[in-house]
């Protein structure tokens, strides 16, 4: 709609509702680029236009976070399909990455000042996004200066040590024995 005021209003309402229920974080907005009509998450994404995503995400995030609730921008990055989403390789070149897939996330970090960000399930350049050094360290923390919290999508981490070393702060597990399994030696010594 390009209506930034309505986006800010929506963010305020979401933030108020979350705060009223005692919630500290909203797992939104989802700002991936809509690339295929078959993507099962299109209903939660904003647009196929990276500029529109950037323009609408910033006031939405600000509206949420003005209510003392953190917005968790997701799914970083290149999460544009549901088929084989846990292991699909997103094969895009650097230009497409920078011009199409990252502008919304960059705006969310630099202008929206989002406090949290969620990694994606898919792979990029051979590494899962939830522990991808290039995305998390080089771009997100290095270039953009993000100092907030990065969490994984549920079950999105395939190497806990690599995730911790590459900048993931919180791993969301799908198993009930996560602590016993993943925090066994030698990882426990590093935490």
Positions of PLM-derived features:
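Glycoside hydrolase catalytic-domain context in secreted enzymes
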Residues: 1-191
């Amino acid at each position: 709609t390009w209506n930034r005021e309505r986006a800010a209003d929506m963010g305020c309402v979401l933030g108020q509702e979350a705060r009223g229920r005692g919630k500290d974080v909203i797992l939104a907005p989802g700002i991936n680029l809509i690339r295929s009509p078959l993507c099962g998450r299109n209903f939660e994404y904003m647009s196929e236009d990276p500029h529109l995503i950037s323009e609408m995400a910033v006031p939405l995030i600000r509206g949420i976070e003005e209510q003392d609730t953190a917005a968790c921008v997701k799914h970083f990055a290149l999460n544009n399909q549901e088929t084989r989403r846990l292991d699909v390789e997103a094969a895009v070149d650097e230009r497409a990455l920078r011009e199409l897939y990252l502008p919304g996330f960059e705006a969310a970090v630099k202008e929206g000042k989002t406090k949290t960000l969620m990694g994606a399930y898919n792979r990029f350049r051979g590494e899962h996004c939830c522990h991808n050094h290039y995305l998390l360290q080089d771009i997100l923390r290095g270039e953009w200066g993000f100092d907030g919290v990065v969490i994984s999508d549920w079950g999105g981490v395939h190497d806990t040590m690599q995730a911790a070393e590459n900048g993931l702060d919180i791993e969301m597990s799908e198993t009930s024995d996560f602590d016993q399994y993943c925090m066994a030696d030698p990882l426990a010594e590093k935490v």
